[in-house]
Amino acid sequence: MGNSHCVPQAPRRLRASFSRKPSLKGNREDSARMSAGLPGPEAARSGDAAANKLFHYIPGTDILDLENQRENLEQPFLSVFKKGRRRVPVRNLGKVVHYAKVQLRFQHSQDVSDCYLELFPAHLYFQAHGSEGLTFQGLLPLTELSVCPLEGSREHAFQITGPLPAPLLVLCPSRAELDRWLYHLEKQTALLGGPRRCHSAPPQRRLTRLRTASGHEPGGSAVCASRVKLQHLPAQEQWDRLLVLYPTSLAIFSEELDGLCFKGELPLRAVHINLEEKEKQIRSFLIEGPLINTIRVVCASYEDYGHWLLCLRAVTHREGAPPLPGAESFPGSQVMGSGRGSLSSGGQTSWDSGCLAPPSTRTSHSLPESSVPSTVGCSSQHTPDQANSDRASIGRRRTELRRSGSSRSPGSKARAEGRGPVTPLHLDLTQLHRLSLESSPDAPDHTSETSHSPLYADPYTPPATSHRRVTDVRGLEEFLSAMQSARGPTPSSPLPSVPVSVPASDPRSCSSGPAGPYLLSKKGALQSRAAQRHRGSAKDGGPQPPDAPQLVSSAREGSPEPWLPLTDGRSPRRSRDPGYDHLWDETLSSSHQKCPQLGGPEASGGLVQWI
């Protein structure tokens, strides 16, 4: 019929009047939009279609007088909860007990958000609007909450802990508002039969039996505890912490306003203590592990530092943990072997045959003149076949070492020394004593093919930090003073440390009975060497099995500061820092040992062979 553009069109403002009936589509949209509004009489008249809608509660303005507007607070609280994949409306939460606008802040966060906080008979609802446009809302059951006021804070605030990712801090505008919130929260929680306030919590256990976040108690009582500063490298911040040493673990706590807060636990079998670091600080040591960042511990005083070293050495020795690295560099320390070779700083090699040897003048330079390894009695009952086989094995080792000594570089020697002792893949209960001796703090570095052990087969996974707190800290000061006054555990090793303040005596004057420890001076060294020449070489006596403990000298190859003896018999570090004299003289002065007769069968076959 032609183009439609040829038909005259009515003006745009009059075009709507030509339609025969209004559009029904717009009316449907308007009615559906009105039915999804706020809950009230209009929503109730919408029928079944409005009942299936999901509503969100939007809090209004601040309510000045709750008594006058009580009828408005009894409206149902509608929200959305997920039940599987479908969403269902929530039941009515009841009347609003208290309502106010406060500020919300999570612990360890500086962001403060305006929050609408509403208290229902059994729930606490909050909706916070962040500065970046984010909205935080949550519905918390009162039976799972713990409310604690912040006494030492300048702000009128209280803390809420419960099923939250972090404790929640509620900042009130005034002290009166804070008191009202605490009153209503405590009242509603008491009506529900749940936990009340922090001060009415059940009493905690003693400080020596602290529970950790993993839910188990550390084995045994606390061995050592003190206030230290912890630095998580490579960060530079230092934190005040309470470090507690148990027989099998290290526990870390922080002193908060409401008590002690658990921070973490480190099993001693998964970490090792490093006493030698490049940037060594005074009174500090490192806690290292394969799955943690290195932690630097800075003690408060020299006495505290020495007490920690004594306790750590005793506990690691008792538990069979790796020895303290760098322990042999301290004056008076001993090195124990198990039938293996060790390299001294002078490039010499010593082979221990499993029994004790008299002191020699060719002691490693890593020890000062005033300290030598002590002697401990051992049996020498062996058959001639065993003696011949041991001598043959020693000869083969000496030949192999001569062949490979010229081709080995100092770096390879250092790598050979850096390997730890070999531990069997299956622990034998009958060999626990020998394993504890081999892994003691006085043991040297051994060359081995594999350094894996069942102690490290299961890597350490730090437990999730929970909100376990110790609120009753009335005995904390007494507990710390008792830990400081205690001298620490006595090492269970049959090889005690050698004191450095006892005068030197003639080794030949020792009897088979108990006697005091002795030290080696220049004169004693010459006498012992003459006695060694008089008795002959080690081939005249039956050597001991290679797995028996033996005291030899050991030092790290390429040490930047070798322990060369000075004219006054002190080490270079001692001359620089006189505090070490007092520390180690006091630490190692309580050792007692047995000195066998040099002419007896105990020492007849235990001579150290030098190449």
Curated annotation (Swiss-Prot):
Its main location: membrane. Changing residue 456 to F: Loss of phosphorylation and interaction with C1QBP. It is a lipid-anchor. One of its GO terms (biological process) is response to hypoxia. Residues 61-100 are annotated as: Interaction with C1QBP. Phosphorylation is essential for its mitochondrial localization and regulates its interaction with C1QBP. GO terms for molecular function: cardiolipin binding; phosphatidic acid binding; phosphatidylinositol phosphate binding; phosphatidylserine binding. InterPro entries: PH-like_dom_sf (IPR011993), PH_domain (IPR001849), PLEKHN1 (IPR042835), PLEKHN1_PH (IPR037839). Residues 570-585 have a biased composition (Basic and acidic residues). GO terms for cellular component: cytoskeleton; cytosol; mitochondrial membrane; mitochondrion; plasma membrane. Residues 341-350, 498-509 have a biased composition (Low complexity). The modification Phosphoserine is found at residue 559. Induction: Up-regulated by hypoxia. Signal peptide: none annotated. Keywords: Cell membrane, Lipoprotein, Membrane, Mitochondrion, Myristate, Phosphoprotein, Repeat. A lipid is attached at residue 2 (N-myristoyl glycine). Ubiquitous. Epressed in several cancer cell lines of differing origin. Residues 1-45, 323-424, 438-468, 483-611 are annotated as: Disordered. It comes from the Eukaryota. It is found in: Cell membrane; Mitochondrion; Mitochondrion membrane. PANTHER family: PLECKSTRIN HOMOLOGY DOMAIN-CONTAINING FAMILY N MEMBER 1. Controls the stability of the leptin mRNA harboring an AU-rich element (ARE) in its 3' UTR, in cooperation with the RNA stabilizer ELAVL1. Decreases the stability of the leptin mRNA by antagonizing the function of ELAVL1 by inducing its atypical recruitment from the nucleus to the cytosol. Binds to cardiolipin (CL), phosphatidic acid (PA), phosphatidylinositol 4-phosphate (PtdIns(4)P) and phosphatidylserine (PS). Promotes apoptosis by enhancing BAX-BAK hetero-oligomerization via interaction with BID in colon cancer cells. This is Pleckstrin homology domain-containing family N member 1. The gene is PLEKHN1.
